[in-house]
Curated annotation (Swiss-Prot):
Primary location: membrane
Entry's Gene Ontology molecular function annotations: transmembrane transporter activity
The keyword Transmembrane helix belongs to this UniProt entry's keyword annotation: yes
Organism: Arabidopsis thaliana (Mouse-ear cress)
Protein name: WAT1-related protein At3g18200
PANTHER family referenced in this protein's UniProt entry, alphabetically: WAT1-RELATED PROTEIN
Region of interest: Disordered: 1-23
SUPFAM superfamilies: Multidrug resistance efflux transporter EmrE
């Protein structure tokens, strides 16, 4: 009777353990799906921002007024949510934290957005997006230097992450450097204003320099944001402070650069749309999504989705700006998808390994050894 009861208990415990394992597995899959969907959405929003920003420059929106309105809208959008939703989880503010927020805004808002607009003025959206594909490599180097990312080249998952990053960057580079033959006729060309900037080599060099500054500041912002989030995990509040300090910094610049009050007046629906998109989507939704993704997966995993954006920008530029689509874009897209698959596989294997290692609890192992030793001593005493 006692034997049957203990057997039933063992079966019950085994069943409960199996159910908990299944629930945990479903939760992990759900988190992965949410993360991947968020990152893909992020790239769609960024791709749209490339096109919208180019339209804004074409119709004459000031390169200083544009980011001021953008960050003001983002602050007005995110600030109330941060105040009401993060009251309980918001840690107390310190001078050190405020200084870190100011520095993050200087890198991630002021330098990042300023260099981007200057670079886009001299280059095309596709070229600007392709330049941004250096961000994963820069982020990877910075994260490794600060010991925020560990790559084990002895194991398969480490090699897959490195190889996938390189393949993705290579695919995006192919889109830029190899044109190939045209696939479709000219796009819709919905934006008919004359394109600003110039196509000469001097202008392209300036565009390259400004966009490289943009990539360096963006990568630095993603890497430095990770340790700040550990100290201050209230993501909405952190985003609000970053937008606030970025707005202040751009206003100071505007006092010296943009003195003509006419440039601050919105005169067309096109200008209004570009500013609303930049503020609500690019600085509001996108910044929060990116902050959440960095918190969930780390800066390198977020940056590795960047090459997908170049494919989206090329398609949008074809449909909206009338840019021609070439076979090089298709070839590059294949490499991008292959690279993303390699990184996702490597990250998945790394998580599996970490989960297996965490299940080997040293305390339970010690307890098991002590019990075995106790049983051994009891048997010896009985003898």
């Amino acid at each position: 009777m006692c034997y049957q009861t203990s057997k039933k208990k063992r079966r019950s415990r085994k069943r409960r353990a199996q159910e908990e394992k299944e629930k945990m597995g479903k939760g992990v899959v759900s988190e992965k799906v949410k993360l991947v969907v968020a990152l893909i959405t992020l790239q769609f929003c960024f791709a749209g921002f490339h096109i919208v920003s180019r339209v804004a420059l074409n119709i004459g929106v000031s390169k200083v007024v544009y980011p001021v309105y953008r960050n003001l809208l983002a602050l007005l959008l995110i600030g109330p949510f941060a105040y009401f939703f993060e009251k309980k989880e918001r840690p107390p503010l310190t001078i050190s934290l405020l200084a870190q927020f100011f520095f993050l805004a200087l890198i991630g808002i002021t330098a990042n957005q300023g260099f981007y607009l200057l670079g886009l003025y001299y280059a095309t959206p596709t070229f600007a997006s392709a330049m941004q594909n250096s961000v994963p490599a820069i982020t990877f180097i910075m994260a490794c230097a600060l010991r925020l990312e560990h790559i084990d080249l002895v194991r398969k998952h480490g090699v897959a992450k490195v190889l996938g990053t390189l393949v993705s960057i290579g695919g995006a580079t192919v889109i830029t450097l190899y044109r190939g033959f045209p696939i479709f006729d000219q796009g819709l060309n919905m934006q008919k204003e004359e394109v600003v900037g110039s196509d000469n080599s001097h202008s392209l060099t300036l565009g390259w320099l400004y966009l490289m500054g943009h990539c360096l500041s963006w990568a630095g912002w993603m890497v430095l944001q990770a340790p700040v989030l550990k100290q201050y995990p209230a993501k909405l509040t952190l985003t609000s402070f970053t937008c606030f300090f970025g707005l202040i910094q751009f206003l100071v610049i505007a006092l010296f650069v943009e003195t003509d009050l006419n440039n601050w007046i919105i005169v067309s629906w096109e200008e209004l749309f570009t500013i609303l998109y930049a503020g609500i989507i690019a600085s509001g939704l996108v910044v929060y999504l990116q902050t959440w993704c960095i918190y969930k997966s780390g800066p390198v995993f977020v940056a590795v989705f960047q090459p997908l954006q170049t494919l989206l920008v090329a398609a949008m530029a074809f449909l909206i700006l009338g840019d021609q689509l070439y076979s090089g874009g298709i070839v590059g897209a294949v490499f991008i998808m292959l690279g993303l698959y390699l990184v996702l596989w490597g990250k998945n294997e790394e998580r599996k390994l970490a989960l297996e290692e965490s299940q080997q609890d040293p305390e339970s192992l010690t307890k098991h050894l002590l019990e075995a030793q106790h049983k051994k001593s009891n048997s010896e005493s009985e003898v």
